[in-house]
């Protein structure tokens, strides 16, 4: 996602070099890039990042603590406003059109979210919008959550002491449906 681009260091180059397609997961950064969060507002209960799940709470704290992620969200929102689409559609389109990405999985808790996000499959961001998003979200080594600390902090929650919450699926209203968007070859 625009909020977590560490795969660009090795995974995408390796996939391109070996002609391997990638399945992108969590392109909305667990909902952070949906446009539903504001600086200083925190996560509302009933949202994925506002759930009682230790894992999503840690992920949310990581996203909310990053000045770069807030700048990225502002960039996504600005481009969405200019294009007359939603921030979710911009974030989904950006991920789906990354090099080597052949499919994208995203989640929707409600039918409204699903219906709002589906048009992203037909949205093609222009070069200028893509360049702006690339610039504002550019990964930097060891800059959480762009580097290994984001993964190690989530992995640390999977220790036996926290296993009951970290490895359980969120209950309603944090649950939902995951969808797979497949890009046609050559599109």
What does each model-identified segment do?
Residues 144-169:
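Acidic/histidine-enriched, glycine/proline-rich intrinsically disordered or flexible terminal extensions
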Residues 168-171, 187:
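Serine residues within intrinsically disordered or low-complexity segments
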Residues 178-186:
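Short, intrinsically disordered C-terminal tails of secreted or membrane-associated proteins
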Residues 1-136, 159-160, 171-175, 179:
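Beta/alpha (TIM)-barrel catalytic core signal, keyed to glycine-rich beta->alpha loops juxtaposed to Asp/Glu
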């Amino acid at each position: 996602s625009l909020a977590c681009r560490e795969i660009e260091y090795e995974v995408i180059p390796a996939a391109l070099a070996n002609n391997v397609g990638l399945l992108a997961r969590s392109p909305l950064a667990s909902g952070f890039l949906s446009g539903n969060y504001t600086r200083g507002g925190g996560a509302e209960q009933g949202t994925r990042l506002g759930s009682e799940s230790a894992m999503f709470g840690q992920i949310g704290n990581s996203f909310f603590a990053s000045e770069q992620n807030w700048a990225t969200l502002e960039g996504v929102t600005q481009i969405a406003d200019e294009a007359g689409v939603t921030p979710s559609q911009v974030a989904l389109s950006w991920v789906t059109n990354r090099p080597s990405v052949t499919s994208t999985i995203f989640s929707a808790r409600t039918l409204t979210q699903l219906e709002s996000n589906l048009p992203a499959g037909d949205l093609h961001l222009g070069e200028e919008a893509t360049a702006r998003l690339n610039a504002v979200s550019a990964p930097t080594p060891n800059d959480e959550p762009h580097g290994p600390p984001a993964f190690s902090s989530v992995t640390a929650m999977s220790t036996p002491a926290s296993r009951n919450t970290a490895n359980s699926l969120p209950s309603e209203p944090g649950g939902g449906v995951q969808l797979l968007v497949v890009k046609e070859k050559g599109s």
